[in-house]
Amino acid sequence: MRLREFTALSSLLFSLLLLSASAEQCGSQAGGARCASGLCCSKFGWCGNTNDYCGPGNCQSQCPGGPTPPGGGDLGSIISSSMFDQMLKHRNDNACQGKGFYSYNAFINAARSFPGFGTSGDTTARKREIAAFFAQTSHETTGGWATAPDGPYAWGYCWLREQGSPGDYCTPSGQWPCAPGRKYFGRGPIQISHNYNYGPCGRAIGVDLLNNPDLVATDPVISFKSALWFWMTPQSPKPSCHDVIIGRWQPSSADRAANRLPGFGVITNIINGGLECGRGTDSRVQDRIGFYRRYCSILGVSPGDNLDCGNQRSFGNGLLVDTM
């Protein structure tokens, strides 16, 4: 009897160990978690450093970049402090809620946690990624208007917290439970919202954002990290914004049938396609494009093709369900 009990117990322990060892480690399968020690995250959610993890078509995040352009692979060789100030010219205007918050140093420090950002591909791809990232986040935080000084596209990063009277944005969840008294309205460059986004974002960057969501609006580095996390993280069936802009994403037959072709327009679709795409001309989409064209001009790169999403079918609701 005791032998049978011991055998059964051993079998149970082995099964539990096997189950724990089989849990996915990273990416969309693990709530946006990242691999340690510079490992790649495979499309199946596992960490490793071989072609099965890092190769084209096998890697979903933390993938190796393309050739490093002359001048160094670091982000500062693409966007300098003076360029940052030129792009976000009025972010420190007295009328802006975010005055003094968004800094170049905070951006660079945050980007170090996402080594593929702005460092993947050739110089054109890298510049377009910087332009696209700041265009989309500038739209989310814009304080500009049609007749604003220096034009409407010089007023990105004006706002820090969602305007109006936002609710708590709490959706019941066993995995990402809302903390008592906390609200998960839009904050930071990408205006991240909802507990089911704050939770995995915090887990990925190593901060408890479910209990401390306002860190996104009080710590500039965490604020930029929240936007970069969204940018770099795919959420099936959507690719990551990063993979689209550097040319890694290749549309499926279903994507092509939906007119989702590589370019800036697909990124808008990823972010807020449920509300903005497939509707013909949309002022919000045009605002995003306006920022993108301006930033491409400052960085000295062409914007590429397929900037609009007016004729694209939506992927569905974006991670950011309510955006400007």
Swiss-Prot record:
Residues with 4-hydroxyproline modification: 67, 69
Active site: 140 (proton donor)
GO terms classed as biological process: cell wall macromolecule catabolic process; chitin catabolic process; plant-type hypersensitive response; polysaccharide catabolic process
Keywords carried by this UniProt record: Carbohydrate metabolism, Chitin degradation, Chitin-binding, Disulfide bond, Glycosidase, Hydrolase, Hydroxylation, Hypersensitive response, Pathogenesis-related protein, Plant defense, Polysaccharide degradation, Signal, Vacuole
InterPro entries for the chain: Chitin-bd_1 (IPR001002), Chitin-binding_1_CS (IPR018371), Endochitinase-like_sf (IPR036861), Glyco_hydro_19 (IPR016283), Glyco_hydro_19_cat (IPR000726), Lysozyme-like_dom_sf (IPR023346)
Isomerase is among the record's keywords: no
A GO-annotated cellular component: vacuole
Bridged cysteine pairs (disulfide): 26-41, 35-47, 40-54, 59-63, 96-158, 170-178, 277-309
EC code: 3.2.1.14
Superkingdom of this protein's organism: Eukaryota
Domain Chitin-binding type-1: 24-65
Propeptide regions on this chain: 318-324
CDD domains named in the record: chitinase_GH19 (cd00325), ChtBD1_GH19_hevein (cd06921)
Signal peptide: 1-23
Modifications made to the protein after synthesis: The 4-hydroxyproline residues are not glycosylated in this plant vacuolar protein.
One MF annotation (Gene Ontology) recorded for this entry: chitin binding
Induction: By ethylene.
Catalytic activity field: Random endo-hydrolysis of N-acetyl-beta-D-glucosaminide (1->4)-beta-linkages in chitin and chitodextrins
Protein family membership: Belongs to the glycosyl hydrolase 19 family. Chitinase class I subfamily.
Record-given protein name: Endochitinase B
Species assigned in the record: Nicotiana tabacum
